[in-house]
A protein has these predicted regions:
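Positively charged
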Residues: 1-175
Length: 175
């Protein structure tokens, strides 16, 4: 599924203040906006570094942690589920264009890492941000969302997803 860097665990960033790292972060933010994405991981631009950028686009707010629509940068992020509850989330990916699939994700996660200034950041999020963080950190671990799917019947083309991949239809068919 694409460039080999997407399937390889990314390397930790040692010097966040390195001009090359700062330039990479700027380029990632620009690429995320150009592609109208909610997040981007460095391996998606063929750089094996543990860096993600993400945001909550308008219309995707699900809970209070989603209210802040500013771009966030996490360097060397670590995620931990804050419980065992999961939910199916419909995901797409800039690295797998044209497809969408229902992926089980933890409903809430703790995160920690560093911002672009090198300051330690940590918190707990749910809703859309929890989903995006799990998706992007998976990229840093060499995991693409279809690899997390438990039922490959729940993946399809963007053009068909609206009609044939609705959660109410899927859950009804499984009952």
């Amino acid at each position: 599924m694409g460039h080999p860097v997407l399937l390889t665990p990314a390397q930790s960033v040692d010097a966040i203040d390195d001009p090359a790292v700062q330039s990479l972060i700027d380029d990632m933010i620009e690429t995320m906006f150009d592609a109208a994405g909610a997040g981007l991981a460095a391996p998606q631009v063929h750089v094996s570094k543990r860096i993600i950028v993400y945001r909550t686009p308008p219309g995707r707010v699900e809970e209070e942690s989603d209210q802040d629509d500013s771009v966030k940068v996490l360097v060397n992020p670590v995620l931990k589920p804050s419980g065992v509850e999961t939910t199916l989330r419909l995901e797409g990916c800039l690295s797998i264009p044209g497809l969408r699939g229902w992926v089980p994700r933890y409903t809430r996660v703790f995160y920690e890492g560093y911002d672009r200034r090198g300051d330690r950041v940590a918190g707990e999020v749910g809703g859309f941000q929890a989903n995006v963080l799990q998706h992007e950190v998976d990229h840093l671990d060499g995991v693409l969302y279809p690899m997390r799917m438990t039922d490959l019947r729940l993946i399809g083309f963007d053009t068909e997803a609206e009609r044939h991949l609705r959660l109410d239809q899927i859950q009804g068919a499984r009952s």
